[in-house]
């Protein structure tokens, strides 16, 4: 096979990152994206790296594993991290973006790169003319999904993922909410809608009896724990939401709060948080309220939240099926397939879960596709780093127990020596070692 370029299929977070990493190393890229010609059920635009679910890249501190992964990616010149930094919106200790401007920035940089040729159209066969990175995501078209399914030995893994509703901020009753971040961490970035016990109980009863949109009859309900529909969470017990998205701790009433309080308590019984969704502050999403309720039910029940009694929903919550591969049996730690070293996969379909993790997999796959192009040995990042631990986990866990995985400190190699008992200090030490090891690895 005469090598002239590398194919990347899919211009989501992973595909955009892979294409950029390949092109910056001087190799021409053919980037295929079907949106703009053929839509998916969940994407709203034809822009690259569209944020379909939340607009958050989660925690930014180095004592948070995803914060460490983001810092590692910054040091590896990630296009996704650069665009994210350029279009941040207030989110306390988290990193959130104006989703439209973020996607537009990635799209523009990819389109303007002289070595990247963007081809709009559906790919129905796995290309054999060049080294290829497939990053088509959980919403892969049926035709290509069949070919990937065949690689998977006919076994399909999937789970259901859901998105939260977005409301027009001008329709929020600001007298009943207050601006605050949990524990006052970072700037005051969230609108908080407090509930007393009576309000919460009424909300809970409405939620567990609400009508859900139907699934296909042959599909079981399997959810990723990190993006579980609020109604499914509620059915696990009346207290479940109080330890999850409606957790009130660290969100005390401000002294000047004029709305109804929960008796003499300083902290509400429950709190619903809303996070800014765009730079203008005209849109807010309901944090942790991903849902599969019918749209009429969403309006009826979510307008029970104080401050949202007259809210206009610019997007209702939706749910979609996410497919992922049997990565322990199919993939090398480099994201190349075991049977064909010229074929790479990246993104959520490999079993990494989350925006940042998907982009990180594209970064690693892109680098290794270039090394394959040059006939060089692949790069395997140290297990002491977040960007090395994640591919190690998804390719070395036991296949029958394989589930999508967010980055976390539990998958990063333990520190040498006695275990540090204080969790924050332990995570700080792991992060310090990770960044040191990454720098040393990059200079070899």
Curated annotation (Swiss-Prot):
Annotated family: Belongs to the MnmG family. TrmFO subfamily.
Function (record text): Catalyzes the folate-dependent formation of 5-methyl-uridine at position 54 (M-5-U54) in all tRNAs.
GO molecular function: flavin adenine dinucleotide binding; tRNA (uracil(54)-C5)-methyltransferase activity, 5,10-methylenetetrahydrofolate-dependent
Sorted UniProt keywords: Cytoplasm, FAD, Flavoprotein, Methyltransferase, NAD, NADP, Transferase, tRNA processing
Enzyme class, first EC level, given as a word: transferase
Keyword Signal listed: no
A Pfam family it matches: GIDA
Reactions listed under catalytic activity: uridine(54) in tRNA + (6R)-5,10-methylene-5,6,7,8-tetrahydrofolate + NADH + H(+) = 5-methyluridine(54) in tRNA + (6S)-5,6,7,8-tetrahydrofolate + NAD(+); uridine(54) in tRNA + (6R)-5,10-methylene-5,6,7,8-tetrahydrofolate + NADPH + H(+) = 5-methyluridine(54) in tRNA + (6S)-5,6,7,8-tetrahydrofolate + NADP(+)
Cofactor(s) annotated in UniProt: FAD
Main location: cytoplasm
Compartmental location: Cytoplasm
Source organism of this protein record: Streptococcus suis (strain 05ZYH33)
Entry binding sites for FAD: 10-15
PANTHER family with a match to the protein in the record: GLUCOSE INHIBITED DIVISION PROTEIN A (PTHR11806), METHYLENETETRAHYDROFOLATE--TRNA-(URACIL-5-)-METHYLTRANSFERASE TRMFO (PTHR11806:SF2)
BP GO terms, sorted: tRNA methylation; tRNA wobble uridine modification
Protein name: Methylenetetrahydrofolate--tRNA-(uracil-5-)-methyltransferase TrmFO
A single cellular component GO annotation: cytosol
Keyword hit for NAD: yes
EC id: 2.1.1.74
